């Protein structure tokens, strides 16, 4: 197999849990229009991307959890909290030119 089922279930759990938790925390589902000039964090981007990155880093370090889904769920919750509360502190908004 190209990718193990444990890893795939972890990635899917990370995507689903990050979108659900970020929607519960009040992030909009999509960024404001026009999307390419928007700096508004949303439930669709960058939350699942950060969750996938955290899951991939954890798997590469050898932490797989029980079935991978628990690791993905934890990464999804952490990425949603980070996006909702800390993202603009880490990456400030660009200045308008």
Curated annotation (Swiss-Prot):
Membrane topology: Multi-pass membrane protein
Transmembrane helix found in the keyword field: yes
Bilayer-spanning residue ranges: 7-27, 43-63, 71-91
InterPro entries on file: Prd_NiFe_hyd_3_EhaA (IPR011306)
Alphabetically ordered keywords of this record: Cell membrane, Membrane, Transmembrane, Transmembrane helix
One Gene Ontology cellular component: plasma membrane
Subcellular localization(s) per the UniProt record: Cell membrane
The keyword Chaperone is assigned to this record: no
Function: One of the integral membrane subunits of multisubunit membrane-bound [NiFe]-hydrogenase eha. Eha is predicted to form large electron transfer complex and might catalyze energy-driven reduction of low-potential redox carriers.
Family in the record: Belongs to the EhaA family.
Quaternary structure, from the entry: Putative multisubunit membrane-bound [NiFe]-hydrogenase eha is composed of at least 20 subunits.
Protein name as annotated: Probable [NiFe]-hydrogenase-type-3 Eha complex membrane subunit A
Organism of origin: Methanothermobacter thermautotrophicus (strain ATCC 29096 / DSM 1053 / JCM 10044 / NBRC 100330 / Delta H)
Gene transcribed to yield this protein: ehaA
